[in-house]
C-alpha cells in the first residue's frame, strides 16, 4: 500500500514538473528574465575562456563529453 501511494505521488509530481518546465506555446516563458541577458558580462564568463584547452594534434584522451580541445573535437588527438 505504501509503495502504491509513493508511486502515485511520484507520477503526479513528475507530471506537474513536466507542465511547469515545458515551454509556453505562446512564448510566455521566453522573456522570463529579460534583464539578465543584458546585465551579463561576457568577458567575466569562465565558459568563454579557452586557456586550459589542448592545441590541434595534441593527445586529448578517450573521446569524452566536454571540450578538452580548443576546437571542441576530441578523438584521441585534438582536431
UniProtKB/Swiss-Prot annotation:
Tissue: Expressed by the venom duct.
A Pfam family the protein falls into: Conotoxin
Protein name per the record: Conotoxin VnMKLT1-01121
Propeptide: 23-48
Region forming the signal peptide: 1-22
Family as reported in the entry's similarity comment: Belongs to the conotoxin O1 superfamily.
Alphabetical UniProt keywords: Cleavage on pair of basic residues, Disulfide bond, Knottin, Neurotoxin, Secreted, Signal, Toxin
Disulfides per UniProt: 53-70, 60-74, 69-78
CC per GO annotation: extracellular region
Domain commentary: The presence of a 'disulfide through disulfide knot' structurally defines this protein as a knottin.
Localization terms from the record: Secreted
Keyword Disulfide bond: yes
Organism encoding this protein: Conus ventricosus (Mediterranean cone)
Gene Ontology molecular-function annotations: ion channel inhibitor activity; toxin activity
Amino acid at each position: 500500500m505504501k509503495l502504491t501511494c509513493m508511486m502515485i505521488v511520484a507520477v503526479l509530481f513528475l507530471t506537474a514538473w513536466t507542465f511547469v518546465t515545458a515551454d509556453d506555446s505562446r512564448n510566455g516563458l521566453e522573456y522570463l528574465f529579460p534583464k539578465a541577458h543584458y546585465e551579463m558580462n561576457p568577458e567575466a564568463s569562465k565558459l568563454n575562456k579557452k586557456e586550459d584547452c589542448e592545441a590541434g594534434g595534441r593527445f586529448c584522451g578517450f573521446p569524452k563529453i566536454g571540450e578538452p580541445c580548443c576546437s571542441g573535437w576530441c578523438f584521441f588527438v585534438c582536431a
